[in-house]
Amino acid sequence: MTVAATVLPAGEDAPAYRPRSYQVEMFEASLKENIIVTMGTGSGKTHIALLRIIKELESNPHKLIWFLTPTVALCLQQFKFLSDNIPAVRARTLTSLDKVELWTEQPVWDAILKEMQVVVSTHAVLADAMSHGFVKITQLGLMIFDEAHHCMRRHPANKIMQDFYHPALERHGAEAVPKILGLTASPVVRSNRQELLKIESNLDAVCKTPRTHRSELMTHTHRPHLQQILFTPVLLDDLQVGSKTLKALVSAWTSLRLEDDPYIKKLRKSPLDGRALQKVLESGKTYCNDQLKRFATRSLHIFEELGEWAADYFIHASIEQLKARAGNSADTMGWTDEEKAYLLDIVSKLPIPNIDLTHSDPDRIPISSKFRSLLEFLDTKGEPNFSGLIFAKQRATVSVMEKLLSIHPVTKHRFRCASFVGWSGGGSKDVLGELLDARMQRDTLSEFRTGQKNLIIATDVLEEGIDISACSVVVCFDKPPNLKSFVQRRGRARHRQSTYAIMFATDDESSALSKWEDLEQAMIEAYEDDERRLREAWALEAINEEVVERLEVQSTGAVLTADTAVAHLNHFCAVLPRQPYASNEPEFSYEKDDADLLRGTVTLPSCVHPGVRRIQGQRWWQTERAARKEAAFQAYKRLYEFGLLSDHLLPFKRNLELKETDLTNLPALVEVSEQYDPWVDWACSWSSPDVHQTRIAIKHNGDSRMCIRLTSPTSLPPVEPMTLFWDSETIYTLDFDKPKRMKEIAAESIENMRLATALYLQAASSRQMRPEQDFVTLFGPDLTDLELAEWLNKHAGDEPALEVYSRKDFPTVMGIVRDRSRYNEPMLFKRWVVSGQDDTPIVELECDAVPKRRNLLHRQTLAAKQPDSETPAISSKIRLILAENCTIDKLPYAETIFGRFISVILDRLEATLVATRLCETILRDLEFSSIRHIITAITAPSAQSLTNYQRYEFFGDSVLKFTVSCQLFFQHPNWHEGYLSEGRDEIVQNSRLARAALDAGLDAFIMNKMFTPRKWSAPLISEKISLTPKQRTMSTKVLADVVEALIGASYIDGGFAAAHACIHRFLPEVNLENIDRTTAPMPKDGVTNHTLNDDHLMAHIGYTFTNKSLLVESLTHPSCQFDTTTQSYQRLEFLGDAVLDMAIMSTLLSHPREIPQGLMTKIKHAVVNANLLAFFCMEFALTEKRTNVQVTPTGTVTLNPSTEHIELWRFMRYQGAHLQTARDLALSRHSSLRGSIIHGLKHSPSYPWKSLSQLNADKFFSDIIESILGAIFIDSHGNLAECEKFLERLGLLRYLRRILKDEVDVMHPRNIAQQMAKGEIRFEVLRVPNEGGGGGEDDGATYRCTVKMAGVDGVAVVVEGCLTSEEAEITAAERAVEILVGRGCSL
């Protein structure tokens, strides 16, 4: 699947947006009073309106905002601008395209405006709706007048103000009327001061133009070069030698007989229409007569303006159009069949002109002098990046000029032409001469913006407001009718070194010509005056003003002065967390007092706490330079006082708040203490023993077999039951009774127990026991002291096999058979085999080998093969041994096997004792309900035990990250996300945790030695007492892992309280319990409402915010600069990231099946994948009801209910066209990939890695998921269940459960390929710049991945043309897997 690439990368180098200072100045002025923003075309007036709308939605969300424009085209443009920048706003347009003139019932208007927030319409629509009482002035909270200079005389804009606004203002005061914001580039039409005052009075507003930032305004508005184009006008005689068709048309019209007109004939037939007939005969006006008159007049005008070929084309095309319309039965022009026939008869008699659209000889296309002058001018403007606009007076001229330029040899290969006449009806009632309709110009403006078209011919509809690309050439084919048109058209030429040309006839009256020359001179003088003021400003800036400010930190001697403050402030901002599409530069602005002195204000990036984000200077200065210095000094001083700088007056590079004395990184391997040996303590305890005994009940496949006593010199902790696997069919279960203290025990009894222990150990071994029998731990049968002595006498030692044979003992009471000819090899007795004569029999023993398994804690990996029931199996392990060479132990085999259990019992008992000692020392303040959790947490994987710390370490990692994140977030409300991340990283990094483990002495309790029963020997008192302490080498990662595993064990055993206590034990600086979390750090008061419908959004999220400001903050992107009281979502996203980890961890932990740590890590990596979160963000949509009006051809108005899906991403508050472009391209990819991703998530047995990599969503999509989680967590006072509800509604937890239930394969394709290839595979990803892209970061580069593997000469796989390196790697890996499968490889 091919998906469009994002042209602008969502990386760190993505362009940032920030409102220009003068835009902010005008926005802030609009909050204080009603104003008319007066700025040049292209200087960003609409951005000011956007900021004002957002502010009004926040502060007054229950009233309607009405955006008024003079044209339908401008309505559609402004609506698109608002929808693109505030995508979740409930907005609509009301124009003639909606046939609002037919909405004559109040319920229709009520339904349409219900729950609307912004309406964009023409002035006439609102004026008419108000005049009929459908819309009340009190419903409106803000009215925005685009092109505000129209608010004069009888214009609908002025009607709104005079008939409704001013009367309500006089009667009820300012609270009863909306606020006013006007936008204009030319506040006066006729350059009259009185008109300016009148407009201000009409709009109840004052004109404002940026003053403080005038130089910046001039920087962003480029003045064009004014040029005259002279032409010779058409003489009357030219018509006599010109077009035959035109002359015939004029003749046909002038020679019309009124009596032949179908309308006259109809009136003569009706006696009731005599009066009407008389009126028509006197005026001579009929439908057909008027149509022909206008057609002829337009044709003459075309001839005068463009020439003979143009007039012929216009006439011919119009006639062909008339014929098509006459044959269309669905045409609703209201003319009769007789009138159709009459007009067709007249025009059909005109001579057919010779229209050739493929002429290559310009001389064969007769044109006017005026058009020739235009061609000569355009011929000098054919630069590669040309973009032009030609204004013409009449719609007919526009359509024909576009065709003429498109086919003329001089221009057809140089210009890509289009026409635009707006969306009004124009001459829609004409059946002749109206060659343009709305459908033909639907894509004109967008094609011009993208460069598909580079020359537009338009009427004055493009003078005002319409957002089109800055042009290098603007031509007035007809003189501007007034100053307003002159200024508006001039504003379209905004390219650097652009040209603004006006066409003049050579016989133009000198007074008219001098008027434009005088105006041009006045403009030049005005430009020069601006430049003079700019030079004066630079001269003023050259004044040397000394700013005497100084801050000294006594503890370090660090000094800050006004001269160094700007550089320091720039450095502070430069090291802030970088975000795509957001600027990290400080912004300086200035205000003037009455004495023309300046005071500076600095605004820092939105990630900085609102308390210090905007700082104002304390003094007034003559120069901006001094004001900047002083403002920077005050800002940097406040940053220090706010705790965002170190005592060295530098941004924190290390988290000094942790007050750690040694944060140096440890080497990968360190020398640590040898593992704690509990047998040493027990050996010492035998000198003055406190004897305890516990009874071990042994069951064989569930049936009780025997009981053994374990004797220890000190108290014995509770020992959990053990399961031992003798073979594939035999399982022994060992249950340990509660230990009992023995009051007194005789030395003889101790000695007998040592003998019994030695007997058990020797019975199961072929090795000769050592003579020492001072065992640390003693075992014996469950007998009294007297019975034990008798038992030893009966079962100690062995006897010849022949004696046992002679007694005919039952096999069940026989012991181990030992072959003296083979070094007393132990065998299992099967049966006696007797051969030879009765007087000299040969007695043999059929024996089986004793199982060699020693580590009985693990199941056999391969079950023993079962013999066929009909064919006796002959095992190679069965042997016949002469009885005379054998001895048989007196200890029955049923008791002998216990000797094999002793090593396992002591190994598990040792682990229990180590864990118990750890609980009694380092973890003495923690209470664990089960020692099993501690054993698991301190057992390294290298021990190859039944359990190890890996699962617990996985859980502990999430709990630790979550706890530290919470503490830093609540403890440091002044820290931005960069400090929070750095602080967390320092606390949870392996070197810090390893150091904590060493400082606490935890290293001695980590069990990393593998249990090897064959090398095992029973611990002896004499050996243990003489041991000297040793050291061992251990990985710092193991040390850190055990700390995290103990945290995980604490959480599993006792929840968050236990986990927090465990964390505090190893990391004293982390003490979440002592931090007040009941009151969250709240944003400043002032933003109490979101820009959109909070209630609907919260209902869809599934959580109702007590503090809605948190919801606002969670949706505020770092590029959002207009709200300095709300911090960007980065802090909340930092916290939400940890909350998400906890939610996933909790789900994995609660799953009934115990999931291995490696698989849990893969699952977590898949579920928190940024592209998956982004996909859920794009899918998560609330449904809102809308009402649409449908007008039937008969004029009937019906209301049709509909629903609209509002996705979560639409609620994000942001600024900037580059972010908007990246967002829209990501959404386009989402639309293309949506089906495959949904199928993968719902049905696929594997994770949709490839489809998600192709989505390549910008990070802000996933960020707002995490920031909302953070906001819910804070507002709910740390209730994780509320966060999980949101994740459930989002669909994330539902998919996680499907992964677990259906065992979805989440392994990354690259890892699959590497495992299948046994590591003999190599991936190489290369970024391939687009040759025509200019080589920058946004050059449309693609990625290529090559794969090399063993057994393949050269490159095995090559993948090219991918949008991201991840997509390239995944695609290549999938192809590599296909090759490996073909070879027969498998995982």
UniProtKB/Swiss-Prot annotation:
Its EC number is 3.1.26.-, 3.6.4.-. It comes from Aspergillus niger (strain ATCC MYA-4892 / CBS 513.88 / FGSC A1513). The keyword Oxidoreductase does not apply. Its cofactor is Mg(2+); Mn(2+). GO terms for molecular function: ATP binding; helicase activity; metal ion binding; ribonuclease III activity; RNA binding. GO terms for cellular component: cytoplasm; nucleus. CDD domains: DEXHc_dicer, RIBOc, SF2_C_dicer. PANTHER family: DICER-RELATED (PTHR14950), ENDORIBONUCLEASE DICER (PTHR14950:SF37). The keyword RNA-binding applies. Keywords: Antiviral defense, Antiviral protein, ATP-binding, Helicase, Hydrolase, Magnesium, Manganese, Metal-binding, Nucleotide-binding, Repeat, RNA-binding. Residues 565-659 form the Dicer dsRNA-binding fold domain. This is Dicer-like protein 2-1. Residues 915-1055, 1094-1277 form the RNase III domain. Residues 26-205 form the Helicase ATP-binding domain.
